[in-house]
């Protein structure tokens, strides 16, 4: 064998060895650390299967006995009689309901669709001009000075889908010039802790709204028909969003980047939005419970009528805020 051939053989062996080493490094990625006990404690139960074959049957129905729910649980359909204090459940098989006739009720938008729309009763431009010229209601001095911080500055893995920076909201109008989310520092840090625990379980937090300037709350009120005022906060009292101590959010799946399925859409105005709504699928209710557990563990309380809305425990300590996003220190 010639020396040149020997050098070529050695060079080829080095190249092959390097390629094999690179492949080994690519495939032998370190496994993710096991979730901590505090993260595992958030799990409501073992995660149920999606049971998509039942989705078209799950819902609310009218019957001679009143409104009943057809829900999915443990890969079976159940009829839930809400008129009973105990919410009696019956396995949904033909022999179990006898002659009871039920008719499906259409109660809200389909999952993943745009939410309900309310036609503004006044020009949004006029409402905005008046709201910007108005002042929040007077209050006693607050216990704490405002300290608004941006959630994504504290944790860049938190995702934003700020609905009021788009037209996909109940009034179909952009209210924010920028898609940003601020909260008072203790509340923001609590959201970050919840997100970090959830990430250990394969989920992250997706923010729909956080601090909301008071003038936007006044715009909601002035643009909404009187018979729909129950949908929005009264600017005469302000809201916890105005105080920077409330957040609207959901979960997203880290593997897909998509929001998880919940019993209702965001900002839905039906009973499906209630935090303890009994309907839906096992997985929808499990997702809702996981979000609630994560937020409650960090000092938040869920709004009983909105599964996505959480108020921080010290919201009373902060004043109603009216500063726009662009005037908050970056």
Where are these regions (language model features)?
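K/E-rich alpha-helical interaction surfaces of small helical-bundle regulatory domains
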Residues: 54-67, 295-299, 306, 311
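Hydrophobic h-region of N-terminal signal peptides that target proteins for export
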Residues: 18-26
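N-terminal secretory signal peptides that target proteins for export/translocation
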Residues: 1-9
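Extracytoplasmic cell-surface/polysaccharide-interacting catalytic and binding patches
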Residues: 116-208, 223-305, 314-330
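N-terminal export leaders
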Residues: 10-15
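Peripheral terminal and inter-domain segments
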Residues: 26-134
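Beta-rich nucleic-acid/ligand-interaction surfaces
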Residues: 214-217, 310-317
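A mature extracytoplasmic/lumenal domain signature
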Residues: 74, 83, 96, 164-166, ...
């Amino acid at each position: 064998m010639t020396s040149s051939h020997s050098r070529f053989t050695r060079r080829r062996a080095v190249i092959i060895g390097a390629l094999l080493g690179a492949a080994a490094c690519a495939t032998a990625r370190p496994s993710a650390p096991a979730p901590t006990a505090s993260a595992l404690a958030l799990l409501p139960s073992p995660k149920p299967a999606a049971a998509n074959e039942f989705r078209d049957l799950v819902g609310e129905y009218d019957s001679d006995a009143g409104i009943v729910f057809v829900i999915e649980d443990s890969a079976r359909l159940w009829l839930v009689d809400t008129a009973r204090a105990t919410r009696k459940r019956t396995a949904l098989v033909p022999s179990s309901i006898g002659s009871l006739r039920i008719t499906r009720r259409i109660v809200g938008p389909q999952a993943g669709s745009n939410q309900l729309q309310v036609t503004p009763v006044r020009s949004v431009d006029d409402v905005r001009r008046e709201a910007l010229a108005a002042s929040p209601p007077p209050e006693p001095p607050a216990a704490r000075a405002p300290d608004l911080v941006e959630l994504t500055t504290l944790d860049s893995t938190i995702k934003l889908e700020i609905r009021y920076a788009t037209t996909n909201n109940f009034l179909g109008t952009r209210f924010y010039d920028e898609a940003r989310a601020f909260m008072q520092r203790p509340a923001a840090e609590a959201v970050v802790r919840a997100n970090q625990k959830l990430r250990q379980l394969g989920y992250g937090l997706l923010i729909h709204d956080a601090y909301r300037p008071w003038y936007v709350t006044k715009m909601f009120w002035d643009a909404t028909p009187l018979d729909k005022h129950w949908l929005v906060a009264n600017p005469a009292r302000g809201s916890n969003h105005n105080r920077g101590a409330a957040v609207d959010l959901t979960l997203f799946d880290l593997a897909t980047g998509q929001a998880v399925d919940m019993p209702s859409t965001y900002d839905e105005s039906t009973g499906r939005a209630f935090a303890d709504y009994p309907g839906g699928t096992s997985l929808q209710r499990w997702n809702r419970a996981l979000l609630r557990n994560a937020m409650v563990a960090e000092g938040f309380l869920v709004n009983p009528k909105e599964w996505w809305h959480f108020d921080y425990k010290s919201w009373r300590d902060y004043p109603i805020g009216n500063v726009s996003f662009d005037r908050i220190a970056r």
